Amino acid sequence: MSTKSILAMALATFAISTPVLADDHGGPVTPKPYTTGATLTKAVQASITPDKALEILKAGNARFAADKPLKRNLKGRVQATALGQFPFASVVGCIDSRAAPEVVFDQSVGDIFAARVAGNTINEDILGSLEYASKVAGSSLVVVLGHTGCGAIKGACDDVQMGNLTSLLAKFKPAVAAASTPGEHNSHNHAFVNEVTELNVKQVVQRIREQSPILKGLEDEGKIKIVGAIYNTSNGKVSWY
């Protein structure tokens, strides 16, 4: 069997596991109001606008930063989502162990799609994943989530070269070049690193729009929003762009 055939079968199976927004008879879904902490259903997902999705994430981060996360029945969540998932948002984040999107936004099983790579950048694989999440699975928000003290950003600031990491860090060079913070342009200048981190998030948001006509089209139609954010590893709070 060809690679193309295998990929087509995999995508078909993936799509079946996450139905699009139609009822059991193929008709439109009647939206149902979102309830904080409840397991998402097809009908609830249909009611979550891009602005509402952003509001949910902001509220979740506020709970996390205040050390007041929701109490959830995780086993019940697993059982409730076993046959399908209806996430309301997608997050492109860094692999950093301190910045797990589900944790910093106080979300649970079945709530968000998460794509993670050092430096929260994108490539064709991640763009394809985001397109699936929004176009097929009904997610209404795309978040590019950077974080303070990012090792990948620091590596780019210092022009680190090491194996496959070299080509990854090269993706952050445009942000390094665009930064204008006074002083040395290396990882010892914390203000410079913070500026590069912010610029990288904004540039990735823009590249998503430029490199994915599907996501750009959905955003132009008001069906999704693409936003940037930075998680502060010192206080647990997320700033939005």
Residue positions per predicted region:
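Conserved functional hotspot residues or short segments at active or partner-binding sites
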Residues: 144
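Divalent-metal-activated hydrolytic enzyme cores
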Residues: 22-84, 110, 119-137, 154-241
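Short helix-loop-beta junction
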Residues: 105-114
